[in-house]
């Protein structure tokens, strides 16, 4: 039996990957394709439902994304969100106009409870808006099923053809009824079943890797983080000793991390593991470099060079495994979304790379990666290890990277992580770390004046890394961390705590 497919058409909005995540949370498989995807290709995929995402354009713009009207003749339910809502209106003969009053952020909305999309949802509710244009007149066959004080058509429905549009963003957590809305759309309106899970994903991916690799050799870029670890074990399950894991110790790791990685994968998983000590090589390349994008590119390119050298020693190697996940791809920019910052797994790859890439986790969000890890029998402690970027401490030392600065941030980070664990908060906080922002400040220690480094602490709550909020760590924990770092880490006299959400900030400082 063919797998059910919800096709998410990407029009370039900032929350598009979240839509896919919300669908998958209901154990329904979905894929994201750009709006440039032809109607013939869409037909070939035989989707059970289609979702139009938001976007940054106006439907009346000359170069604005469009969609072939024939998509509405496929006979499958369609849900349009924000720009997608306006595009449905425009394409089917309704009217869209600019609004004198824009709606951004939390907004009160009134819904029509008779509409199946809003079944089981309170009529008077709140939602997350982010738009300038609005629907002024719905297309023929549609009726208004939601409004706000500013937006007279916050939602519309053609129940006969099962085409729906909402101006707000049900995919973000700030819309409290979003989960129920997606449930109603997927199960009540589309009649889909829960037939996709991380267990089925792992089984299918293992078979896929076997088919792709055959009897060829594979090299895995192992960092010891969650993503590369799950990718390595997944590939190892598929091809066993055909996989060689190369762990590049670039001198940018957290405290004791290199030894831990070697112990876990060599002894516990019986993998072919090569540990390469390349600290001097990486620090030499980074000398005098302060620009964060250049640092990322240098680290990414040097990683690949090391792998190529190791591959040459091993003989014929055909494939390289990377732990790339969905947010990596999104933050590197797609055809329809602006580049936020190049990701080390995507943007730093040299054009003359000698391997074919295997990225088994490319479609998954972080929580899904963890679930796959649990399915594969990876120890819980490793599966829930803190996210750590490929460039490592190289992007947690702002400005030029030196061994002295690395030692400062490494020790401060170890103290922070230790006290978070002591407080029982390690699985309650999505990510937490220390960084060195390259700021000196005056202080007083003993009877003397100091002029030392500042350490910034960053801790966020999230479920997918697409959006996050700063973690409300108890004051007594922050107090203990601050006192310990200042007293135990030489060269530091001030601690600051980052209280910025994402957006507007990213989780990492660089």
Swiss-Prot record:
Active-site residue list: 82 (nucleophile), 169, 171
Gene Ontology cellular-component terms listed: cytosol
InterPro entries, A to Z: Class_I_gatase-like, GATASE, GMP_synth_C, GMP_synth_GATase, GMP_synthase, GMPS_ATP_PPase_dom, NAD/GMP_synthase, Rossmann-like_a/b/a_fold
Enzyme Commission (EC) number: 6.3.5.2
GO terms of molecular function: ATP binding; GMP synthase activity
Functional pathway: Purine metabolism; GMP biosynthesis; GMP from XMP (L-Gln route): step 1/1
Keyword Chloroplast recorded: no
Domain Glutamine amidotransferase type-1, residue spans: 5-195
Database matches in SUPFAM superfamilies: Adenine nucleotide alpha hydrolases-like, Class I glutamine amidotransferase-like
Enzyme class: ligase
Residue intervals of the GMPS ATP-PPase domain: 196-385
HAMAP family registered for this protein in UniProt: GMP_synthase (MF_00344)
Subunit structure: Homodimer.
Name of the protein in its database record: GMP synthase [glutamine-hydrolyzing]
Native organism: Clostridium acetobutylicum (strain ATCC 824 / DSM 792 / JCM 1419 / IAM 19013 / LMG 5710 / NBRC 13948 / NRRL B-527 / VKM B-1787 / 2291 / W)
Lineage: Bacteria, Bacillati, Bacillota, Clostridia, Eubacteriales
Gene name in the database record: guaA
């Amino acid at each position: 039996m063919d797998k059910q497919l919800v096709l998410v058409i990407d029009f370039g909005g900032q929350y598009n990957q979240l839509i896919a995540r919300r669908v998958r949370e209901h154990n329904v498989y979905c894929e994201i394709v750009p709006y440039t995807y032809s109607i013939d290709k869409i037909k070939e995929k035989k989707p059970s439902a289609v979702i139009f995402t938001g976007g940054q354009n106006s439907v009346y713009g000359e170069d604005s994304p469009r969609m072939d009207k024939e998509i509405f003749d496929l006979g499958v339910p369609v849900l349009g969100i924000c720009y997608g809502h306006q595009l449905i209106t425009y394409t089917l003969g309704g009217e869209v106009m600019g609004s004198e009053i824009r709606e951004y952020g939390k907004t009160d909305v009134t819904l029509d409870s008779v509409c199946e999309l809003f079944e089981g949802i309170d009529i008077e509710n709140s939602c997350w808006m982010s738009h300038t244009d609005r629907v002024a007149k719905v297309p023929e066959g549609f009726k208004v099923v939601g409004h706000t004080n500013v937006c007279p058509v916050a939602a519309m429905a053609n129940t006969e053809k099962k085409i729906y549009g909402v101006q707000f963003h049900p995919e973000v957590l700030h819309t409290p009824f979003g989960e129920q809305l997606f449930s109603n759309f997927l199960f009540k309106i589309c009649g889909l079943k829960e037939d996709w899970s991380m267990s089925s994903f792992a089984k299918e991916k293992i078979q896929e890797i076997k088919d792709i690799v055959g009897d060829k050799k594979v090299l895995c870029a192992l960092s010891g983080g969650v993503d590369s670890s799950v990718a390595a074990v997944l590939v190892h399950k598929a091809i066993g000793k055909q996989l060689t894991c190369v762990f590049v110790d670039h001198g940018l790791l957290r405290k004791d991390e290199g030894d831990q990685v070697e112990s876990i994968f060599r002894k516990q998983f019986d993998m072919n593991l090569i540990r390469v000590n390349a600290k001097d090589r990486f620090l030499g390349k980074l000398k005098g470099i302060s620009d964060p994008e250049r640092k990322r590119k240098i680290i990414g390119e040097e990683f690949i060079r090391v792998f190529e050298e190791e591959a040459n020693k091993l003989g014929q190697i055909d494939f390289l495994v990377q732990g790339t996940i969905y947010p990596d791809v999104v933050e590197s920019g797609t055809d329809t979304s602006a580049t936020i910052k190049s990701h080390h797994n995507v943007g730093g790859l040299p054009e003359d790379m000698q391997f074919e890439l295997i990225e088994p986790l490319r479609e998954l969000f972080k929580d899904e990666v963890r679930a796959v890890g649990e399915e594969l029998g990876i120890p819980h402690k490793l599966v829930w290890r803190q996210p750590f970027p490929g460039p490592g401490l190289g992007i947690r030392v702002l400005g030029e990277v030196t061994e002295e600065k690395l030692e400062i941030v490494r020790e401060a980070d170890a103290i922070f992580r230790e006290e978070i664990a002591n407080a029982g908060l390690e699985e309650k906080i999505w990510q937490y770390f220390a960084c060195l922002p390259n700021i000196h400040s005056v202080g007083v220690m003993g009877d003397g004046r100091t002029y030392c480094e500042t350490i910034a602490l960053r801790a966020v709550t999230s479920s997918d890394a697409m959006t996050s909020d700063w973690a409300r760590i108890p004051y007594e924990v922050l107090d203990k961390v601050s006192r310990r770092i200042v007293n135990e880490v030489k060269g530091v006299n001030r601690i600051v705590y980052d209280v910025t959400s994402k957006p507007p900030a990213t989780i990492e400082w660089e």
